[in-house]
Amino acid sequence: MRKYINYLLVLCLVSSCTLDTEAEPEVLETSTTTSSTTTSSTTTTVQNIDEEIVVDEFGIELLDVSPEMKQQFDELIAFVEKRTGLTYSEYPKFNLYTLEGYRDYSAASYLDDFEKDYEEGEWERAVLSENMWGLTNASPEKMKELIVEFQRCASAGSYNLLDQILRVPIKRNQTKLNLWEQSVIVHELVHSLQGQIIDLSEWYTTMKDSDDFMNYPGRRSIMEAQADLVQAYWESNLDSYDRQRMASERPNFRCSVSLPEYFYIPFDLYYDFGARLGKQIHSNGRMEALNEALYKLPTAEQVYSPEKYFSEEPYINVEIKNLELENFTVIDQGQIDSLDLVYLLQTKIGQKDAVNAAIGLGGGSWVDYVNESNDLFMTVKISGDDVNELNEISDAFQNWADFQTRFTKSLSNSSWKGILYEGDTNFWIYNDGNFLRLALSNDIEFMLSFLSDCSNEQCNTSF
């Protein structure tokens, strides 16, 4: 279940959505970001092809930095330091591309990581999981193509957590950065400063090595909130004429294909709900409070619901049993956070109901099983903050299933408890008042056998 969802979270690091809205003059209302934070594991190797062209590690042309641009960078760095109250430990590293070159870099770095991140058959299982959850009908090949396009079109700039390089597309043959480019660079310079203060490279490496990204969404949201705020401060210095000029300088970032809506769900957390939380933190303690928040690791639930951030509501660890199943073995397991619930539910029941359910999450765990045919069997166990919140989460998943024509609903019988939704994917749901349990399988005979097996001291469904 989670491997692919996690990968989309990492994907969001690679390239964040570029939205069309302009920053509001009131700096307390944080502007919409136009850039992203990246995590490609490659390091930049600048090579001299000849005396006129310099390229990066993928052979993509890097543009020269004029003395005027260097002076602009110095001024923007000073601005970021003044607004954050923090100081760079070293001069930020940056690469400048043409727009097409930047898109080529985004795609190439993703494909380079793809080959390193996925073992044989793992990508196919990941996409099968997305199919079973009803997020997409795409094949593994088509999904890969969509994500490559997503990389190409969804970002106006990036900061790489690992090699700590800021990358921004600019116009060729100009001696000075235009206003749009400077605004994007301000945002990315904040990320560069955050990376130096916190050592984001080490933090990300630890998450990747353990394959546990539970702490990522919350910190990412705080990082984007601060970067958006500083960017809004910079844009607030522009008069109405310069704002219009900056808007006219914005490149066309539209995607050439229609991308699935759920691709953007993590960005709603980082740039919308995160901005709201960041605004409250800033209102309570100004920039010093945001600086302190960078060291915290809020849950996604705390970002969706700021009052839970300030009350420091804890995440509850939920134990789930690894079952002994004929012909199936455990392939992966992990924990669930509120972003996962919204990610699974939103496209079927809407954002409002999905988020309302997610902010009642106590905790959750999942286990994926696979057989020799690479068929998946997935189990999920969820707790709520209280019985009412658990019931709301249960109702949300039942509505999720009821709204899908691919399912036929079957009530429980004498052999098993809960509700079974039958179809090409079979979905079982049971709420015992303490935990919500879910199971998914593409084999109805296996599912019925699983639900009816109480030959041991406990039924299978007591996982």
Which stretches of residues belong to each language-model region?
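Extracellular mucin-like PTS domains
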Residues: V27-V46
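Post-HExxH zinc-binding segment in Zn-dependent metallohydrolases
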Residues: L76, I197-S201, T205-E249
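C-terminal motif of bacterial Sec signal peptides marking the signal peptidase cleavage site
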Residues: V14-S16
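Pan-zinc metallopeptidase signature
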Residues: C255-N374, M378-K381
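Short Gly/Thr-rich strand-loop-strand
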Residues: K352-A357, E389-F435
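Catalytic zinc-binding patch centered on the HExxH motif and its immediate surroundings
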Residues: R103-G121, K142-L166
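Bacterial signal peptide processing site
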Residues: T18-T21
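Short pre-active-site segment immediately N-terminal to the catalytic Zn-binding motif
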Residues: L166-V186, G218
